[in-house]
Every structure is written in structure tokens, then in C-alpha cells.
């Protein structure tokens, strides 16, 4: 697996199947997005790419932990620091410059609440509008649910905060572990 922490150094000539988001904790909802890009990549001989925005210290998982978890599952993991340049980039520019010109996206899988670009102006409606123009297939994946509540990193953090590791593991879909001194 290629592990990229500097987006300017990533290059591919291959068509890609991309999923984008924070991917904090790599919970069951994230796992479904990843399975969708894997399926497309296998069927269409494309490169599978997880594009994760690095949100800093508040994250459940570091980039290195994501790398260890995804090793052997996807072709490329991009950890994109949430810099001012990324934060200020207009949504249309993100689609054109990042998804199309740099990633060569042929397929994009995102959750129903995915937003991107300056002031979160980009959303699934915008991705749908641009799909035909740029020739990518878009799949919107419904949120995973547990006990009638959407699985999210916030839900996992809440469970861990009150010591409910068992619930956190059900939401994650794997055993939770932490390292420290």
C-alpha cells in the first residue's frame, strides 16, 4: 500500500476508485465505503484510494494507525493535512484539481452527509452535478446504524468517555485498543 502524507507528491496515471472523509476510527460506516471502492477497483482494474482529511489531535486514530489498519486492503491511503489551502479551496476547484487532475477519479463513494470545499459548500448534490462532466461514477452510501442511531466517531467517543468499550467495539466493528505511556 502506498502511504501519502504530502498530497503534492502523489502521482498516478491509473484510474482510481476514491472514498473521502475524516475516517476517524475507521468504524463500520467507513468500512462499507472502503468495501465499495475495493469492489469497483477489482472489477474495473482501478486503484483503490482512501483520501482521509487529517483533523489533528482530536482524532481517535493517527495516520499511522489508519495505515496499519488499511495495509493490504487498499492500494493507497492519502492522509491530507487540513491546511488553510485545503480549507479555503472552493468545492469546484477541489473536484477539478484534486479528484480529477490528481487522483484521476473514475468512481467516488461518499456518505450522505459528506461536505467539502470552502465553507463546506460542496456536497453530494454538487458531486452528482459534476459526475457527467468529468466522467466519474458516484455512489452515495447510507449511514451505518446501531440501535437506531447513526454510527459516527462522535458516538464512539461518547461510548469511550463513559467507559463503554463494548459499545465502542460494536460501532467500530473490531476490538478497540489504545497505546500510551
Residue ranges with predicted function:
Residues 1-181:
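Nucleotidyltransferase catalytic core that binds NTPs
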Amino acid at each position: 500500500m502506498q502511504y501519502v502524507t504530502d498530497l503534492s507528491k502523489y502521482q498516478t496515471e491509473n484510474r482510481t476508485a476514491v472514498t473521502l472523509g475524516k475516517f476517524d476510527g475507521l468504524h463500520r460506516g467507513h468500512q462499507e465505503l472502503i468495501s465499495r471502492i475495493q469492489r469497483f477497483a477489482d472489477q474495473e482494474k482501478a486503484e483503490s484510494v482512501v483520501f482521509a482529511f487529517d483533523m489533528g489531535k482530536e482524532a481517535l486514530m493517527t495516520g499511522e494507525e489508519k495505515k496499519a489498519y488499511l495495509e493490504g486492503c487498499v492500494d493507497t491511503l492519502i492522509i491530507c493535512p487540513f491546511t488553510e489551502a485545503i480549507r479555503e479551496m472552493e468545492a469546484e476547484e477541489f473536484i477539478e484539481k484534486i479528484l480529477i487532475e490528481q487522483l484521476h477519479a473514475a468512481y467516488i463513494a461518499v456518505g450522505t452527509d459528506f461536505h467539502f470545499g470552502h465553507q463546506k459548500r460542496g456536497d453530494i448534490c454538487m458531486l452528482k452535478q459534476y459526475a457527467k462532466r468529468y466522467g466519474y461514477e458516484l455512489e452515495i452510501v447510507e449511514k451505518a446504524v446501531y440501535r437506531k442511531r447513526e454510527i459516527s466517531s462522535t458516538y464512539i467517543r461518547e461510548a469511550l468517555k463513559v467507559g463503554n468499550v463494548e459499545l465502542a467495539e460494536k460501532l467500530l466493528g473490531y476490538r478497540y485498543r489504545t497505546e500510551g505511556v
